Amino acid sequence: MSRRGTAEEKTAKSDPIYRNRLVNMLVNRILKHGKKSLAYQIIYRAVKKIQQKTETNPLSVLRQAIRGVTPDIAVKSRRVGGSTHQVPVEIGSTQGKALAIRWLLGASRKRPGRNMAFKLSSELVDAAKGSGDAIRKKEETHRMAEANRAFAHFR
């Protein structure tokens, strides 16, 4: 048994302008090579573009997009008796949000377009409307979990 205590769960910090934890999570995921100021620039430009496109509160669009992409259930590989099964597992809210952000950023990176701010804003608006690559990824994950429902007892 381990002698060390369990690590306390850190509270997510919020960003300086919008005072929003989701924005900060997005910044930390978009970050590359330690260039945080560039990550903030990209996010804030994307938020401005969302404001121009939808003429609504961009943070509510962001929340709606993340809520729409967040998966409830996923599959995990589990080895049972020499064969590997995809076992459906429920996902917690924090892990679900992290997955949603990862999928949104992945989908926006794959998009054709001028710059990352433009691509991210387009993907967020699409996800808020219920379309886009990230939403398709969520639906695909749910389909996989539904197809492998028979292995749920391996949990």
Curated annotation (Swiss-Prot):
It comes from the Eukaryota. One of its GO terms (molecular function) is structural constituent of ribosome. Its main location: plastid. Pfam families: Ribosomal_S7 (PF00177). One of its GO terms (cellular component) is chloroplast. InterPro entries: Ribosomal_uS7 (IPR000235), Ribosomal_uS7_bac/org-type (IPR005717), Ribosomal_uS7_CS (IPR020606), Ribosomal_uS7_dom (IPR023798), Ribosomal_uS7_dom_sf (IPR036823). Coiled coil: none annotated. One of its GO terms (biological process) is translation. Keywords: Chloroplast, Plastid, Ribonucleoprotein, Ribosomal protein, RNA-binding, rRNA-binding. It is found in: Plastid, Chloroplast. One of the primary rRNA binding proteins, it binds directly to 16S rRNA where it nucleates assembly of the head domain of the 30S subunit. NCBIfam families: rpsG_bact. Belongs to the universal ribosomal protein uS7 family. HAMAP family: Ribosomal_uS7_B (MF_00480_B). PANTHER family: RIBOSOMAL PROTEIN S7. Part of the 30S ribosomal subunit. This is Small ribosomal subunit protein uS7cz/uS7cy.
